[in-house]
Amino acid sequence: MARIVGVELPNNKKTFVALTYIYGIGPARAKEILKNTNIDGDKRVKDLTDEEISRISKYITDHYKVEGELRQEVERNIKRLIEIGCYRGIRHKIGLPVRGQKTHSNARTRKGPRASRIKKK
């Protein structure tokens, strides 16, 4: 298994698919990385040479925030929203949808399981 920016990439996957296992890299960015490093995206990870792996790794670290660094930035942004007390920060704080979705009958994922009520006889 190839290790790029601290993530083990599965050997049997094509390179452009395997790169999406890295937090912060989606399909479009994976193809862009492979294009700029002159590596065939249809090549399997197990067939990559050490030189190609190091080229990909260097390109990613030089051009993008990924994994822990990106997670920390997102977390800091959310903390800042909470601290300044804006609408989005308040919604994050109380665990409700942030982007204007309706919550009367939906948003179960964000709100958590239903609180059951005890029925009176």
UniProtKB/Swiss-Prot annotation:
GO terms for molecular function: rRNA binding; structural constituent of ribosome; tRNA binding. Disulfide bonds: none annotated. Keywords: Ribonucleoprotein, Ribosomal protein, RNA-binding, rRNA-binding, tRNA-binding. GO terms for cellular component: cytosol; small ribosomal subunit. It comes from the Bacteria. One of its GO terms (biological process) is translation. Pfam families: Ribosomal_S13 (PF00416). The keyword Ribosomal protein applies. Residues 101-121 have a biased composition (Basic residues). Residues 97-121 are annotated as: Disordered. The keyword Ribosomal protein applies. InterPro entries: Rbsml_uS13_C (IPR027437), Ribosomal_uS13 (IPR001892), Ribosomal_uS13-like_H2TH (IPR010979), Ribosomal_uS13_bac-type (IPR019980), Ribosomal_uS13_CS (IPR018269). Gene3D superfamilies: 1.10.8.50, 30s ribosomal protein s13, domain 2. Located at the top of the head of the 30S subunit, it contacts several helices of the 16S rRNA. In the 70S ribosome it contacts the 23S rRNA (bridge B1a) and protein L5 of the 50S subunit (bridge B1b), connecting the 2 subunits; these bridges are implicated in subunit movement. Contacts the tRNAs in the A and P-sites. Belongs to the universal ribosomal protein uS13 family. Part of the 30S ribosomal subunit. Forms a loose heterodimer with protein S19. Forms two bridges to the 50S subunit in the 70S ribosome. This is Small ribosomal subunit protein uS13. The gene is rpsM.
